[in-house]
Swiss-Prot record:
Its EC number is 2.7.7.3. Pathway: Cofactor biosynthesis; coenzyme A biosynthesis; CoA from (R)-pantothenate: step 4/5. InterPro entries: Cyt_trans-like, PPAT, Rossmann-like_a/b/a_fold. This is Phosphopantetheine adenylyltransferase. It comes from Mesorhizobium japonicum (strain LMG 29417 / CECT 9101 / MAFF 303099). It comes from the Bacteria. The gene is coaD.
């Protein structure tokens, strides 16, 4: 049987329950899912690459048990299609929260298909309970001392609280 490999790219700064929702759905589509953390030299993320790897690994293990081992965390810079090819992925996962996401992601999928016709983009709609969550809003709420526990895994909530307590 051919192993289906997918790549789900993002900054994951921080990992949210919305990201976990997409990762869970991805496990139904692929045997192995790479959570690919985009590294952009011009951006200063709140969490380092190493911290984001650890948070993703901790959260997926806690949330998915043994299935969490099917999620691998990697870094990439440059084009996501190159990251997918490097990992041997034939599927690129994209989460959709709303129509705005769909419009943008359809444009990206079209461009990616032109450059890499062997890769299939799969859109996964977010569950209603996580559709409003964005990492940007989570960071803003955390920076103002708000309760971010409904929006992120427990390990991420602790790490965010510690970051902003300094």
């Amino acid at each position: 049987m051919i192993e289906r490999t997918a790549l789900y790219a993002g900054s994951f700064d921080p990992l949210t329950n919305g990201h976990l929702d997409v990762l869970k759905a991805s496990l139904a589509v692929a045997d192995i899912v790479y959570a690919a953390i985009g590294i952009h030299p011009g951006k200063k993320p709140l969490f380092s690459f190493e911290e984001r790897v650890q948070l993703i690994e901790d959260a997926t293990k806690a949330e998915f048990g043994r299935d969490g081992a099917r999620i691998k965390v990697v870094a990439f810079d440059g084009l996501v299609i190159d990251a997918a090819r490097k990992q041997g992925a034939s599927i690129m996962i994209r989460g959709l929260r709303d129509g705005t996401d769909l419009d943008y992601e359809m444009q990206m999928a079209g461009m990616n298909e032109t450059m890499a016709p062997e890769l299939q983009t799969v859109f996964l709609p977010a569950s209603p309970s996580v559709r409003t969550i964005t990492a940007t809003l989570v960071r803003q709420i955390a920076s103002m001392g708000g309760d971010i526990r409904p929006f992120v895994p427990a390990a991420v909530a602790g790490a965010l609280t510690a970051k902003f307590a300094k």
